[in-house]
Amino acid sequence: MHGSTGFVQGTRPAGDQADPLPVVRVSSESMTRYALYFTPVDDSPWAQAGSSWLGRHPASPEPVQQVNIPGIPRILLSSLTADARRYGFHATLKAPFRLFEGFNEEHLLQMARAFCAAQKAIVLDEVRVRPLMDFLALQVNGPLDEIGGLAMRCVTYFDLLRAPLTEPELAKRRRAGLNARQSALLQRWGYPYTEEFYRFHMTLTDALMHADADVIFTIRKAAEQHFAAAVAAVPLAIDALTIAREEYPGAPFVEWQRIPFSGQGERASLPHSGRIFFCVGPSGVGKDSLLNWVREHSAGDEKLVFAQRTITRATQANEAHEAVDTASFWRLAAGGQFAMVWQANDLCYGIRRGIEADLKAGRDVVINGSRAYVPQLLQAFPDAIVIWIDASENLLRERLEARQREQGPALLKRLKRAKEFAPSEQAQVIRLDNSGALEAGGQKLLDILRQAK
């Protein structure tokens, strides 16, 4: 299943000679939080009404003129909508979260684009101002199953990117008087009001438990009147996903990206996952040359990604891996930065976790891998395709000598290792003979990648 790494946090892979490292607690370095919202399109009556009601447009941190309610002092209305204003006029689909180590905004954005391409707009029934617990919100009568399905797809699909809540964050949530089921949801999804507890709503006030009944009545009637024009003008439809950003604790959540839904299927769904193409073969077989040829001849294919390796060796000519020293490599590994880790030829190799987001977004990932790692790969990623590249022993020696990277005992060691692994007979292992010209081998590899789609 995509998302598993085949590497236990805090230990080296099985078969390594070194002692295990201690388990390291992982936390997000960034203070930025992201939330997945529905927000009405900018110039719609709904967006205009929501912005003037709360006193802030979702796309800007700056306040705007707030609506005037006769009988309610402006300072009182401002204080009773302060938290709602900070979060902006929206409906939550996935509650705020920090990005987990190894993921960045580009991963979030590419997953969001893939997600939205598989979603269809949902027209909401009977949008009304109603009390929800101790605050006021716009709520709807339906279609509840479709809305709940969309929210749950958001919660599950993007959870790969979510950093776990810290102990203080968990404790703060638990103080809200959660029941056992809500506590379990908090632990699982980072938010207690998911699954059967999810209620689609667009918050209009903060908690009103300490406000006078007359004040609450006046604000509710004003809200009903304020949104009546939008209700009459155009139906409200969940037609896009908004990514909102909180730059630092307490800052306003500001709209960063709004991505329209564009699903063409009969029903909304999750994006189809991409596949891993794990290219292996002995030293000198020409993997790097083949992969470079394919990369050049597939330029512009946004659905094909060539994973960068992290290696404990300095980069040389025509190489593009991330070079780190051994201590840094194992710190990254213990911190959960890698989806794959292996060792070969006295070097450490890692593939960063960003490939998991690529796969979720439906992109195929090509990896320059290791034959020894194939069993672990297929355990962690059962759908992976292994491309086993081979050539004659004499040709391997010629190519190793020509590249002049290893000499003497190091060269002999690589030649000896070339004989230590035999291709697996599993169905997802594809043999590729690279004994001929580069163009011929490269075209074979490119055909494999294209035919597998």
From Swiss-Prot:
Keywords: ATP-binding, Nucleotide-binding, Transferase
A Gene Ontology molecular function term of the record: ATP binding
Enzyme class at the top of the EC tree: transferase
InterPro entries: DUF1045, GK/Ca_channel_bsu, P-loop_NTPase, PhnN
Residue ranges, annotated region (Ribose 1,5-bisphosphokinase): 272-453
Highest rank taxon of the organism: Bacteria
Family: In the C-terminal section; belongs to the ribose 1,5-bisphosphokinase family.
The protein's role, per its UniProt record: Catalyzes the phosphorylation of ribose 1,5-bisphosphate to 5-phospho-D-ribosyl alpha-1-diphosphate (PRPP).
Full protein name: Ribose 1,5-bisphosphate phosphokinase PhnN
Lineage: Bacteria, Pseudomonadati, Pseudomonadota, Betaproteobacteria, Burkholderiales
